[in-house]
A protein has these predicted regions:
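Amphipathic, hydrophobic secondary-structure cores in small proteins
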Residues: 13-66
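Iron-sulfur (Fe-S) cluster-binding modules
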Residues: 1-2, 79
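Intrinsic-disorder/low-complexity, polar/charged segments enriched in Ser/Thr/Lys/Arg/Asp/Glu/Gln
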Residues: 8-10, 35-39, 71-73
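Right-handed parallel beta-helix/beta-solenoid
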Residues: 2-12
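Core SAM-dependent methyltransferase catalytic element
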Residues: 73-79
Length: 79
């Protein structure tokens, strides 16, 4: 993947368990304009497959992702 883009919004989902990171992500993306990017940070290991499935189902692509000190970081662009 390319370098991480500068996010338009940052969503802190650290400490939250499924399904809350996806619930908060869905709400955040609905409030954004097309092509804007949200950076979501989560600590629930289930976030990796959950965000991938959510991205595929909603057509909002993950443009970058990484793990830093057990924090999963996802940059998602609103379609």
């Amino acid at each position: 993947m390319a370098d991480a883009p500068t996010p338009d919004r940052i969503l802190d989902a650290k400490g939250l368990l499924c399904p809350m990171p996806i619930v908060k992500l869905s709400k955040a993306v609905k409030e954004m304009e097309s092509q804007q990017v949200v950076l979501m940070e989560a600590t629930d290991p289930g976030s990796v497959p959950d965000v991938a499935a959510w991205s595929k189902n909603t057509h909002n692509p993950i443009v970058h992702q990484e793990v830093v000190d057990k924090v999963m970081r996802f940059w998602i662009q609103k379609a």
